[in-house]
Amino acid sequence: VAMVLTMAAGCGKKEDKKDYFVFYVNNELTKVVAKKITLQHTSSGKAQVKELLKDLQTQPEDATLRRTIPRKVKIQNIDLISYQITVDFSKEYYDMKPTEEILTRAAIAKTLLQLSQYVTFTVDGKPLVDASGANVGAMNLDSFVENPGEQINSSQKATLKLYFSN
């Protein structure tokens, strides 16, 4: 009997835990850094979105990184419809400086894009606009360009010879 119970215990459904990445902004506000995690919620959907957002709201163990979502910015609502996640933030989202906002937006979106094809942000129920007032709209992985250099605002100077034909 004990052997049958032992065998039956091993036949239970094993939940596969998948590794995900949470993206954090470094303290110098120059790049986004990925840290691997394993989600506790194995079922897809809103529970996973909430878990990832909670990780983005906490201070990472790595002292060179900052929490992605600033403490004063609150998540007011989360919608998960078809292939799109919409996150509504409090008005304090707009208190970030432009560089911090862009890196924060990239880190949140890249984290959530592991669960959906598109991510949209709203602030107090209205579509997110950037520093120039343009509507940001739905974001996907193609919305972000990786900067291979260390500096976000780096530039290069070169002398070139240009040849023109008539």
Regions found by a protein language model. Give the residues of each.
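Bimodal "functional hotspot" detector
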Residues: G10-N166
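Bacterial N-terminal signal peptides
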Residues: V1-T6
